[in-house]
């Protein structure tokens, strides 16, 4: 079990590290590097715990609290978000500290009562601008609905310029250290991008508005302590700037080709498209979906300007392994992307129309409709067309 970690004098990380989790939100999100469930204790004249942990790790949380002060006494329990990975230990904490006063949004209170109807607790509904004094420090709250649940809010400690934004600015990564200056910067940003792309992308417009709101009130931020992953203390501006880019849909001259194949015909088309894109000066990421992690593909789509999806026809439909990516894209609604559908068929088609309909449903602009299709096997002229389309797309998305 890891130990409490001081963020500054009197403020501690008291969360838990989950080294073994490999899927999150059921099977929806791959977590190859594990995750953390971050909770924070603020000790002043009064003591506040900001968020809890996933229920299986409740004893770790309680043990850390006892290392700081035993017996544990909490004046406040701040619930930024009621999802089980953050509020799963709510019953255990309320049993340990039944007099703790819960601070949360109205939507969070409604969710807590739905999840834990058997627990009675004292509470105050907070809104943006509500402030609670702990002594030398205070807590100020900023509602953040749909980032990423309706109940979500940020907690801010103005005296320390410390932002506790729950799921915002987080990453799914398990580490033995807690801060951004202790972990490879590229690794952290890669996991932060994957987190944003797969969880927060549908809420990009709201994120832009929230970042603008924070800027308008001139919120000083020295440290960002999210509820998953590392704490940003060296360069919190880096992740804020990244969120601003991602939320606006800023991309680069990059294309993602995601496909699968039965007897290599669609694969040959994918490679010809890639050759054209590369010849046009474009960065390319190529994924055969049956051997690729869908969440990693979506992470690469985040900063790409073009998305090319290929499938042969099977039973007048697309390959089953291709469908989940398209389903995700429809829900995630990536911004400012152009796309192309391609594939092979035998005696009857069908996949091409489905691919194009799904890409359009994801608000991806088709650069050619219909895209390239071939019967049975691609010939030289078919591959040349794919190559030329690749060059055309590269020119379209060039910097």
Swiss-Prot record:
PANTHER family: ANAEROBIC NITRIC OXIDE REDUCTASE FLAVORUBREDOXIN. It holds the Pfam family Flavodoxin_1. Induction: Constitutively expressed. The lineage of its organism: Bacteria, Bacillati, Bacillota, Clostridia, Moorellales. Residues 255-394 form the Flavodoxin-like domain. It comes from the Bacteria. This is Nitric oxide reductase. Homodimer. InterPro entries: Flavodoxin/NO_synth (IPR008254), Flavoprotein-like_sf (IPR029039), Metallo-B-lactamas (IPR001279), ODP_dom (IPR045761), RibonucZ/Hydroxyglut_hydro (IPR036866), Rubredoxin-O_OxRdtase (IPR016440). Keywords: Electron transport, Flavoprotein, FMN, Iron, Metal-binding, Oxidoreductase, Transport. Fe cation 2 binds at residues 85, 167, 228. Its cofactor is FMN; Fe cation. GO terms for molecular function: electron transfer activity; FMN binding; metal ion binding; oxidoreductase activity, acting on NAD(P)H. Residues 32-221 are annotated as: Zinc metallo-hydrolase. Has nitric oxide reductase activity in combination with Hrb; probably involved in nitrosative stress protection. It comes from Moorella thermoacetica (strain ATCC 39073 / JCM 9320). Fe cation 1 binds at residues 81, 83, 148, 167. In the N-terminal section; belongs to the zinc metallo-hydrolase group 3 family. Its EC number is 1.-.-.-. Binds 1 FMN per subunit. The keyword Iron-sulfur does not apply. The gene is fprA.
